[in-house]
Amino acid sequence: MQVSKDALKQLIRAGRGVIPASKVLEGGYLVNVMSNEVYLADVAIYEERIVAIGKVEEYKGPETEVIDVTGLYLLPGLIDGHLHSECSKLSITSFAKAVVPCGTTSIVSGLDEYISVSGLEGLQEVFKEVKKSPLKVFWGAPYKTPYTFPKSTVAFNFTEEVHQEVQQWPECFGVWETVREAVQEEDEDTLGALATAQNNRLPIFGCAPMARGKELNGYLCAGVRLDHESYDHEEVVEKMRNGMHMLIRESSVTHFLEENIRAVTEVNPYLARRVSFCTDDVTATDILEKGHMDNVVRQAIKAGVEPITAIQMATINSAEAYRIDHLVGSITPGKIADIVMVDSLEGFQVQAVLTDGKLVARDKKMSYELKAPARSSVLSCALKCATTTPEDFQYRVEIEQGTAEVLSMNVKGPFVRKRRDVTLQVANHIVQADTENDVLMVSVLERFGRNGNKSLAFCSGWKLKKGAMASSAAPDDNNIIVMGADASDMSIAVNHLIENGGGQVIVADGEILEFLALPVGGIVSDLEAEEIARQESLLTKAANSLGCDLPDPLMYMFFLPITAIPDYAITDVGPVDCIALTTFDPILALNPGK
């Protein structure tokens, strides 16, 4: 998004009407998010920039393309203020094809899942892919990788020294996903990244679920200025009263909008000016069935927010918070011509989308063919771990027979993991899973060829009666995670991923029930959203057939390695107490017996 002196000269001339507009949108209602107004106005565009709004007849020339938008409402391209696009299992190209027709023209992302598996070399390839896409990605450099505490294993460690380099890149718009624990523990790399950002006058993006009181104050003193993690509207209000810009998250697995928007609809309407929206993690299925940021706007309107206010939350509010409002966020002269046309403000159905002044989508479909680039070996990376045997997933203890008192990580929701103490049988020195009482084995295997780490613990909440499921896509480190009732099936599942370069798989009785290949970094695919959604449905049905009743069994599983989510997690270094930030032994006591 670099601007040359000559390009600036041409744009100024177009703004003054000296050069005719390339395109004029005529007859529509302009949603002016700057003045909080909706009124009849035309829009003149020169190449990729807006040059005039209102009466623009004098901007027309003989070659100007005039598009009749009578009756439609024109609003800025929607911005997802915090997104891991990789969690959709769609590559940037495939993701753009899915969300741009829904009106999303910009996302703010750390592209951190790509970095964790392929480093800066892979990131540069993704940047090239973004430039050929109609979707803008405003990149924040991850505050560090891995995010986990204690430190897990990734392909690339994002350190203070790396920040000193990448914060100078033109693609860098800030520091991404600064978790509270890293600040609280005064992690040296984290403090170095934040100090570098402040010296470079770059914003620092946060991740601080349940941070209140002194913890919040200390976090804010580190320079963090916005957050996307609040579990209730009181938390939103406290953070905003202390100076934070808040993003309300409405993802595929966490539906916080209805609760968090109460900060605006019930506590203080004035807060709306410093509230934005994000989806964080969204599935291909949800995009196809509900939409993307357009769905979030509709949900906000349904919750009682005025339509123009909801649109501001999805556009200019994010743009100003991330300091990108000189480029996007409003339909005003000088801004990039990312424009969404909807049928009405209340129904908010997207009819057409322009990005960079070009019509790219109409009637929820792309207007041109967008192809993914050829993949190099950097992103088509193999899973560099040894094949497994059933013994790798047997929890061995010193007693031959008896029982084991065990701490099982009990999933109550995608972001709620509590302690559950259970008693399991021990046979031939092996602690047995207990499907009748919903206790499975879970393991994470390092897959980058660094150290061969493998952890083993116990989990509850999936209710599998038999079989196993595994994934090589598992934020934040994207090592292989596998869980199951049977060690043999767990081994088969992991080996299938290794042999096929990554993906997600369901196994039972030694047979592969369903497999979704994720060949790009082992985390995403170039398949269309429709095909990913179809295969996601088959995976869920396969898990359901084994007894699981969770709405998205694999997504619930692949969030388990995130140590920023209380109270428990598991990484390649072991099961983690996310409050104490230490690994722990899941065996509480052993009781010998016959």
From Swiss-Prot:
Catalytic activity as recorded in UniProt: adenine + H2O + H(+) = hypoxanthine + NH4(+)
Gene3D superfamilies in the record: Metal-dependent hydrolases (3.20.20.140), Urease, subunit C, domain 1 (2.30.40.10)
Any GO molecular function: adenine deaminase activity
Record has Hydrolase as a keyword: yes
Keyword Manganese tagged: yes
Enzyme Commission identifier(s): 3.5.4.2
InterPro entries: Adenine_deam, Adenine_deam_C, Amidohydro-rel, Metal-dep_hydrolase_composite, Metal_Hydrolase
Annotated TM spans: none
UniProtKB keywords: Hydrolase, Manganese
GO BP of this protein: adenine catabolic process
Top-level taxon of the source organism: Bacteria
Cofactor(s) the protein needs: Mn(2+)
Family membership noted in the UniProt record: Belongs to the metallo-dependent hydrolases superfamily. Adenine deaminase family.
The name this protein goes by in its record: Adenine deaminase 1
